[in-house]
């Protein structure tokens, strides 16, 4: 059976921590920021841990991470 390939799009967007959690950046900070409050922009600049069902799907795309 051939080796599984890493999904390059998923690899660029998420990181798997040493404990196995999947971490990604929050969305909605690229453009149209003039109408968002400073608090909202600051909060969207942080990373967050994905929910368990999403994390399991991402781990299938990143078999060697």
Swiss-Prot record:
CC annotations in GO: cytosolic large ribosomal subunit
Entry GO MF terms: structural constituent of ribosome
Q: Which Gene3D superfamilies does the record match to this protein?
A: 4.10.410.60
Output the SUPFAM superfamilies linked to this UniProt entry.
Answer: L35p-like (SSF143034)
Q: Write down the superkingdom of origin.
A: Bacteria
Enumerate the Gene Ontology biological process terms: translation
- Please give the Pfam families that the UniProt record associates with this protein: Ribosomal_L35p (PF01632)
Matching HAMAP family = Ribosomal_bL35
Fill in the subunit field for this protein. Part of the 50S ribosomal subunit.
Family membership? Belongs to the bacterial ribosomal protein bL35 family.
The protein's name is Large ribosomal subunit protein bL35
Question: What species does this protein belong to?
Answer: Thermus thermophilus (strain ATCC 27634 / DSM 579 / HB8)
